[in-house]
Amino acid sequence: MKIVVMEPLGVKMEQINALAAPLQAAGHDFVYYTAKATDQTKLLARVQQADIIMLANQPLSAEIINACPNLKMLSVAFTGVDHIALAACRERGILVCNAAGYSTNAVAELTFGLAISVIRNIVPCDARCRQAGTKDGLVGFELFGKTFGVVGTGAIGSRVAKLAAAFGCRVLAYSRTPKAELQADGVRYVSLDELLAASDFVSLHVPLTDATRGLINAEAIAKMKPTAVLLNTARGPVVDSEALAQALNEGRLAGAGIDVFEGEPPIAPEHPLCHAKNTVLTPHVAFASAEALAARADIVFANIEQWLAGTPQNVIK
């Protein structure tokens, strides 16, 4: 079979070569691209004859999928798969597997990096030092003793809840599927409205679905404390950026730490959050630790090997 890795996976070629070696030894044709395709025509030229495509976060449209007559499997080096035309895959009987769990620690840790950056004024402090300034006006506040709301308690949300408790926070959670383990640790599951109203921090950890798109809109933001901080390391469209920026600029929300946007960075300079007060922005890097990238490469190659062996894993239903 022809296996095409249509974009780089962010790890050293030594790891790629080691992971590809068993597939090549079994007679499979393996192609690895070290840069993203710059347009859809070039992308199609890469993948059109593939039996298996491996990708990270570059969108894969129905048009591209349907133009690949031999395509049987996608191994996605990401947790979310909202950038892939899943309906087209289902219609064609193409198996889709993801890299479940690879970035749990990385995303959870950056969530708190963003939180602390916002509440302790890390970015303004850095600028002040470089400008030979003082600490005047840069008094922050602590995580300890605050109420930390976690929206979505999958693997990442659960890890965030445990870290919040370790910081001395009272932890609230909202999820369709409460976790007994978290409840045993003192996490209290509540309605989304109660979480929004009671939390000093609201941290988002839900996939992008029809139900979660625009979940945090103007109405939801209005239910939050004016002293609260919103954290989004999930998916950009879960939040209405215009409504969030307006609330921040009008003082109806204290701050925000945002890693994800409506599309992949670079984001336009005129994006509303680029001009919002008390906001720390990062260019979708929550997943991007060396450890996480190495782990996801292992997972997506294992997905292929397991499928070839007739025992697929990490299957997206």
Language-model segments: residues:
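N-terminal glycine-/charge-rich "phosphate-binding" loop or analogous flexible N-terminal tail
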Residues: M1-A50, L172
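Phosphate-binding beta-alpha-beta segment of Rossmann-like dinucleotide-binding domains, i.e.
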Residues: R92-I94, A100-T147, R159-K162, A166, ...
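Structural signal for repeat-unit boundaries in curved repeat scaffolds
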Residues: V47, C68-L71, L196
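Rossmann-like adenosine-cofactor binding region
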Residues: A62-I65, T177-P272
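Rossmann-like dinucleotide-binding domain for NAD(H)/NADP(H)
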Residues: V96-C97, T227-K317
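Glycine-rich Rossmann-fold phosphate-binding loop(s) that bind the pyrophosphate
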Residues: T153-G154
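Glycine-rich, N-terminal phosphate-binding loop of Rossmann-like dinucleotide-binding domains
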Residues: E7, L55-N57, F78, L204-V206, ...
